[in-house]
Amino acid sequence: MAATSIIQQLFNSCDVATVGQFSGSHSLAAVGSTAPITNLFITIFVGFSVGANVIISRFLGAQREDRANQAIHTALVLSVITGFIVSVIGEIIARPLLEMMSTPTEVLPLAVLYLRVCFIGMFFLTIYNFESAILRAGGDTKRPLYCLIISGTINVVLNLVFVILFKLDVAGVALATTIADATSACLLFRILSKEEGALQVRLDRMKIEWIYTKEILIIGIPAAIQGMLFNISNIIIQSAINSLGADIVAASTVAMNFEMYTYFLITGFAQAAITFTSQNYGAKNYKRCVQSIRWCMLLGALFTGSVSALFIIFSPVLAGIFTSDPAVVKIACIRISIVVAFQVINMTIEIMSGALRGLGNPMISTVLCIVFTCALRLAWIFIVFARIHTFESVLVVYPVSWAVTASSIVIAYLVVKKKKLIM
C-alpha cells in the first residue's frame, strides 16, 4: 500500500517537474496553489472509501462473504455518485475559491484552468479509490499497484506530449492526469469483474443496499470530515503563503512534493492499520489487533524517519529537479527542513486514527483533529502570522499542531485499547 501511494506521488512529481522545467515558475505556482483544493475534495471520497474498506474487511474477517459482496456493490454505486457530485461542485467553485485564497493575479488564470480540468478527472479518481479499497479489504495490494504503474506511465508520456509538443501548459498536465485516472479505474473494474467469490463485481448486482450504505457512512463520514478539516486549515495556510508572492508559492509547490512522499508512505501504514485491525477485530482476535498496530507504528517510524532524513540532506539537489530558479530552490529547502523533519509525528496521528477507525471508533480522532489541529492552525495564522509575516512563521504551525494532536490521539487509543482489546 505504501509503495502504491509513493508511486502515485512519483507520477504527480513528474507533472510538477514537467511544468516547472518547460513552462516556468508561474505555471509551477499555478499548479501548487491548487493543491490544497484538490486535496480537500480527494479526502471526501477517500474518507468514504475508508468506510467501505473497514466494513468489507470486517465481513471478510467474520467469513460473511455474502454480506461482503453486497457491501462491495453498494460501495461502487456510492463511488459513482460521490465522484459526480465532487466533479460538479469543483467546476462551479474553482475560480471563486482560488480568488478567496489570494492566489497571485499573475498565476490565477492558469490555476483556474488547471483546476477545472483536474475536476473532470476527479470522477474517475473516486471510482479508482473505491475499487482499490475493495481489493485491499481482500488482502490484494499488488494489482492496484500494477494498474497504477500502467496508468502513471501513460500520464508521464502524455505530460511530455501535451506540454512539450502541443504547448498546452498546465491544461496539458491536467488532461494527462485525467486520462490516466480513467485508465486506472477501468483496469481495476475489469479485475473486479473477473474475480471469483466475495470480491466479484457484476453490473446486474449494482444497487444501493441502505443497511451497508449506513455502515459505510458511519465510518466514512468522520474520516472524510477529518480529512476535509485538515485541508480547510491547509487552504487557510496556502492563502497565507499566496500573500507572500509567486516565488514562495512556487517554492512551496516544490517542497510539498517531498512532504507528499512521506505522507503517502505514512498513509500506506495507516491503511494497513485500518485493514488489519478491522479484520482481526471482526474475527475477535484482539491480540493480533494490538500486534498489527505496534508493527505499523514501528515500521512506519523506521521508513518515514529514513525517507525524511534523505530528503533533508539532499534537498538542494532534489528541489533542482523541479525548477532551475536558484531563489525558488533556496526557499523550497527551507520548507523541507521545517516540515519534512517532523513527519514522524504526523505518522502517529494517521496510524492511531486508522487503528481507532478499525476498532469502530471513527469519531474520536475526528473530534481531536478538529480541536487540536484545525483550530490551532487557524488561530496561528490569524494571530502569529498576522504579527510575524514571514514564510517560516507559517511553516512552524505544522510541527506544533502535529505534536499536540498526536499526544491526544495516543491517549485516546490507550483508553479504547483498555476497553476493547484487553480481556
Language-model regions: role of each:
Residues 1, 5, 17, 54, ...:
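Transmembrane alpha-helix boundary and packing residues in multipass membrane permease domains
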Residues 2-54, 118-125, 214-279, 300-308, ...:
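Transmembrane helix-bundle signature of multi-pass secondary active exporters and lipid flippases
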Residues 10-13, 22-25, 59-62, 137-138, ...:
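Helix-loop interface residues and adjacent transmembrane-helix termini in multi-pass membrane transporters
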Residues 28-88, 125-144, 251-315, 346-369:
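Small-residue-rich hydrophobic transmembrane alpha-helices
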Residues 49, 117-136, 144-152, 173-186, ...:
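Short runs within selected transmembrane alpha-helices of multi-pass transporters and secretion channels
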Residues 56-121, 154, 165-221, 277-342, ...:
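Short alpha-helical transmembrane segments in multi-pass integral membrane proteins
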Residues 375-385:
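Transmembrane alpha-helical segments of integral membrane proteins
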